[in-house]
Amino acid sequence: MTDVQVIAIDGPAGSGKSTVARAVAARCGLGYLDTGAMYRSVAFAALHGGVAPDDAEVVANLARNMELSIDPDGTVIVDGVDATIEIRGPEVTRAVSIVAANPEVRDEMRARQRRWAAERGGGVMEGRDIGTVVFPDARLKVYLDASPEVRAARRSKEVADLSYERVASDLA
């Protein structure tokens, strides 16, 4: 993977990863991938299919077999269904940490992330552990953080149906 030039942007929810990653990708003319949207897509597929997020084997199979498209404009298509709005909603938000803790799901998403970068010769990728686990040799690694108050305010703006207080408690 040494010929793949990745800019890895990491940080907690609401720290500005997506905003910065999109701006860097646009400015540098590079592809952009929100890896968190990938995990949210698996959670969406599970919930949409009536599968409990903690059913590790079934969720891992969903991750391996789902068709996933994440466009540069943020449109997310999961198995032919536009999930752009739903993956940011409260139901998926509650389920995604369970799904993302599944080692087989992580293995599949990591493989898809590496494949995405290899097909493009690199790009700007944002998400948790992108610079430590997925691309430890990334050309540039950025870690963003913000105060809990700023993170909660940013996240509640992203998810209009969540109150500031609910987001603050989820981020704590």
Question: In which residue ranges do the predicted regions lie?
Answer:
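Phosphate-binding P-loop
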Residues: 1-4
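Hydrophobic anchor at the beta1->P-loop junction of P-loop NTPases
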Residues: 7-9
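P-loop (Walker A) phosphate-binding loop of NTP-binding proteins
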Residues: 12
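Conserved lysine of the Walker
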Residues: 17
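Hydrophobic positions on the alpha1 helix immediately C-terminal to the Walker A/P-loop
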Residues: 20
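ATP-dependent small-molecule kinase phosphotransfer cores
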Residues: 37-122, 132-134, 149-152, 161-172
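Glycine-rich phosphate-binding loops of nucleotide-dependent enzymes
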Residues: 130, 141-148, 158-159
